[in-house]
């Protein structure tokens, strides 16, 4: 009778590539009370040699690639190694214990495993004193999963994984492997189809279009402990974000700077320009350059386009050394259809949402995630925790939140299925986002979350305990749209669109807002910021300086996409660097200097950021001069403060040597910033010392200007402020109230 390991059914499954439990058949097996047997599977081999405690022995050859060697009882995995056909000597993968445990299984299938990035994928480790790589993957509908790579000739029968749970987790420890080893998954589906897949939990990948996963050794020595300890104290401070696409900020010798080259240059530039944070367009791995990173295939991997895993860690560490926070754009709303990645991962739509008639999102032709599956939510949650823990990022900006919240986003009637209450809200996505924010804020206080959300979905920045989603900030897309819509109007038409400026104040404090001028506004025919401005060159640059000043003064945190700070003329393209040579031209130099000084004023002025989410931080002065396009308001650090900033914006092209503003009683008024300064390329007007007028004098001035009739007694008289108002400019005054 053949020994059990030659059981025809077991061997047939192994040889045909459908064996889900190779660990039960291979490795060290007990044969009798006094003897064990080493059982090996080497498809295609004629002979196999084993080094057993220093002695080389030839294994017995059975049929179909099965070899065995009888050994004394109590042999351990460390006691023997096997010669491979390429001459290498390595320990037997099937002799080592499986480490995926019941707690791992419980947490993962519940969707709450907070260190899943240290369990799934390819994890270098040491088992029983033997170094190697442990491979674990979730593929519940596969008949067989193998790890293939340069270490086994990319042969799918050599290293099949063991199915460690009936819920589809597979595991194998491959001794002797080290960082740098390339691998993929080979799967046999329920229908018998063979699939080759990249690792969803892979920490690094070969350069596109080569989609191979790469084992990494995370051994970087961080030097930012002081930054991390102090990070929570910075959350209520100023936030002035510079949005950057790594591959097109600056080039050298015709190629983008890599992470390490970029680190010092960008950190120094941000310090010079008084930015507090950089926000990186996705640096998660992605196959298509033109997606800008927003079609992600490697949720746990920095893109290899700009350097290594460690290089990006160096970049973030360097930013922290210079006092600059790092925010990562992250895309949990959809993923690309590329067959090498997650789509149809184990032969079924494992990660995909399938309840709509078409699984593809109409906007991006991508798949949306199925948030009803705990394992999918754990995959996404693990991704963001990985970036915070292993890469030390300080904030996560969630892309396209609206597409997650609404089942009908981008779809017409009949193209979507309502939730169980008949509504259009994606209840599973809402629960995931609440879990996402809860876990991050509990586990990593001081790490901030941002929602790019373009609808009126309520309570985006309200705590989860109070029924909200729990984000720290929401991008104010309405403010951005209305502001740019106004600025694009030619000057004669602006009086008819004054509400574009005033309406956003009606909801400015309904959420904790961030005011963005992002990459999305300078592509696809929308023109650059300077290109949106009407008029001749002088007026365009004056308007851009005015716009930057307006953004700085408005309540909310700030974000500006790279190039806007010096008046980039062309639309942004990911395939070229910014037009830095424009800084040789005086107009662009002026905008650049103006932006620098506006940023400096912002970070030094608590009135502009300390309470910018509270109504008490903002008080209108005047927005009635629609014809001339003048608005003015006060900004306060707290409700009881006597010190305030008076912000005056003139959106027209006229010049007023004497312009009278109604104002609260003032003790003093000093000019801090004038975007019409000749140093910035302006006309140099607006520097006359402002005059504070008592109510009596202010009334006389208004009568003389024809603003009121002499016998008009409607309403109380107010104080006045007589200023010199330059064309198309922002003026910022420091005022002390009586």
Swiss-Prot record:
GO terms, biological process: glycogen biosynthetic process
Q: Has the keyword Calcium been applied to this entry?
A: no
> Which reaction is recorded as catalysed by this protein?
Transfers a segment of a (1->4)-alpha-D-glucan chain to a primary hydroxy group in a similar glucan chain
Q: In which pathway does it act?
A: Glycan biosynthesis; glycogen biosynthesis
Q: Which family does it belong to?
A: Belongs to the glycosyl hydrolase 13 family. GlgB subfamily.
Q: How does it assemble?
A: Monomer.
Q: What is this protein called?
A: 1,4-alpha-glucan branching enzyme GlgB
């Amino acid at each position: 009778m053949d020994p059990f390991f030659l059981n025809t059914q077991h061997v047939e499954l192994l040889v045909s590539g459908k064996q889900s439990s190779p660990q039960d058949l291979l490795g060290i097996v007990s044969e009798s009370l006094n003897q064990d047997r080493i059982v090996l599977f080497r498809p295609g081999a004629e002979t196999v040699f084993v080094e057993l405690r220093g002695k080389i022995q030839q294994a017995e050859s059975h049929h179909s690639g099965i070899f065995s060697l009888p050994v004394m009882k109590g042999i351990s995995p460390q006691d023997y190694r096997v010669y491979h056909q390429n001459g290498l000597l390595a320990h037997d993968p099937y002799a080592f214990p499986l480490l995926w445990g019941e707690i791992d299984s419980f947490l993962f299938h519940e969707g709450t495993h907070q260190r899943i990035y240290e369990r799934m994928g390819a994890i270098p480790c040491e088992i029983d004193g033997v170094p190697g790589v442990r491979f674990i993957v979730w593929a519940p509908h596969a008949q067989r999963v193998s790890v293939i790579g340069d270490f086994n000739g990319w042969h799918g029968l050599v290293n099949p994984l063991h199915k460690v749970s009936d819920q589809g987790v597979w595991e194998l420890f491959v001794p002797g492997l080290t960082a740098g080893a390339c691998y993929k998954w080979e799967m046999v589906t329920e229908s018998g189809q063979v699939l080759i897949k990249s690792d969803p939990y892979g920490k690094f990948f070969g350069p596109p279009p080569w989609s191979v996963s790469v084992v990494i050794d995370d051994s970087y020595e961080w030097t930012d402990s002081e930054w991390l300890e102090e990070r929570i104290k910075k959350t209520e401070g100023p936030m002035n974000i510079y949005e950057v696409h790594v591959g097109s900020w600056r080039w050298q010798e015709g190629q983008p700077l890599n992470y390490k080259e970029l680190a010092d240059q960008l950190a120094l530039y941000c310090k010079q320009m008084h930015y507090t944070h950089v926000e990186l367009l996705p640096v998660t791995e992605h196959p298509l350059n033109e997606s800008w990173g927003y079609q992600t295939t490697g949720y746990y991997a920095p893109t290899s386009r700009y350097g290594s895993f460690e290089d990006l860690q160096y970049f973030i560490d360097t930013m922290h050394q210079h006092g600059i926070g790092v925010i990562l754009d992250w895309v949990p709303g959809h993923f690309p259809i590329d067959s090498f990645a997650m789509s149809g991962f184990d032969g079924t739509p494992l990660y995909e949402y399938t309840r709509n008639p078409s699984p593809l999102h109409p906007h991006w032709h991508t798949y949306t995630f199925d948030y009803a599956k705990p394992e999918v939510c754990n995959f996404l949650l693990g991704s963001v925790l990985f970036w915070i823990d292993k890469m030390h990022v300080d904030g996560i900006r969630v892309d396209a939140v609206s597409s997650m919240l609404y089942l009908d986003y981008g779809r017409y009637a009949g193209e979507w299925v309502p939730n169980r209450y008949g509504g259009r809200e994606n209840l599973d996505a809402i629960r995931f986002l609440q879990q996402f924010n809860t876990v991050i804020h509990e586990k990593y206080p001081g790490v901030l979350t941002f929602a790019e959300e373009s609808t009126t979905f309520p309570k985006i920045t309200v705590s989860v305990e109070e029924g909200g989603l729990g984000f720290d900030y929401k991008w104010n897309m309405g403010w951005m749209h209305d502001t740019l819509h106004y600025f694009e109007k030619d000057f004669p038409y602006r009086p008819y669109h004054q509400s574009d400026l005033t309406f956003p104040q009606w909801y400015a404090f309904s959420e904790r807002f961030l005011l963005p001028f992002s990459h999305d506004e300078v592509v696809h025919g929308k023109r650059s910021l300077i290109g949106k401005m009407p008029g001749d060159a002088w007026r365009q640059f004056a308007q851009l300086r005015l716009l930057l000043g307006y953004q700085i003064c408005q309540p909310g945190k700030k974000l500006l996409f790279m190039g806007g700070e010096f008046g980039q003329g062309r639309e942004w393209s990911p395939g070229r660097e910014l037009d830095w040579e424009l800084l040789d031209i005086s107009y662009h130099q002026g905008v650049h200097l103006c932006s620098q000084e506006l940023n400096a004023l912002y970070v030094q002025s608590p009135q502009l950021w300390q309470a910018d989410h509270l109504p008490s931080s903002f008080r209108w002065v005047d927005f009635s001069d629609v014809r001339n396009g003048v608005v003015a308001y006060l900004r306060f650090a707290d409700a009881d403060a006597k010190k305030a900033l008076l912000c005056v914006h003139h959106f027209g092209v006229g010049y007023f040597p004497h312009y009278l503003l109604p104002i609260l009683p003032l003790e003093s008024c000093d000019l801090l910033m004038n975007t019409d300064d000749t140093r910035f390329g302006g006309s140099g007007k607006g520097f006359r010392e402002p005059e504070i007028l008592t109510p009596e004098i202010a009334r006389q001035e208004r009568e003389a200007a024809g603003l009121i009739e002499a016998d008009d007694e409607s309403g109380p008289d107010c104080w006045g402020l007589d200023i010199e108002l330059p064309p198309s400019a922002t003026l910022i005054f420091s005022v002390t109230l009586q």
